[in-house]
Amino acid sequence: IFKRLCEKAKINDNFDEIVVNSDIPVIVDFWAPWCGPCKMFAPIFNETSKKYPLKAVFAKVDTEREQTLGSKYHIMSIPTLVVFKNGREVKRVSGALDPLRLSTLINEFI
């Protein structure tokens, strides 16, 4: 989901275009519906995204539905958070983060 976050279809159909053309960091949560840690992290990611409405774009990519994106970005474990800035991957963190660690990560790039 891209919610400033965009709609699911748009993020998946236009992922590369959105990442490359964004003038602000893009924070992507690669996840799957069956993943317990992903379910625990989802509300943290969603709530934290509301704190940065114009400073970062937040996206969720379901690696089950979008296997091509998961493969392209070499997602080996989930959840994996990938930060893109100026169209390039600048940081990657695997595993669920607590709210403070997530905010610290975001603040590194805004």
Regions found by a protein language model. Name each.
Residues I1-E7:
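N-terminal targeting signals for export/organelle localization
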Residues K8-P25:
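A short beta-strand-turn-helix
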Residues D23-P25, A42-V61:
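Conserved helix-turn-beta segment immediately C-terminal to the redox Cys motif
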Residues D23-V26, W31-W34, S77:
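Short pre-active-site segment immediately N-terminal to redox-active cysteine/selenocysteine motifs
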Residues F30-I44:
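Conserved redox-active cysteine motifs that mediate thiol-disulfide chemistry
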Residues V61-S71:
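Structural microenvironment flanking redox-active thiols in thiol-disulfide oxidoreductases
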Residues S77, V82-I110:
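Non-catalytic, surface beta->alpha helical segment in thiol-disulfide oxidoreductase systems
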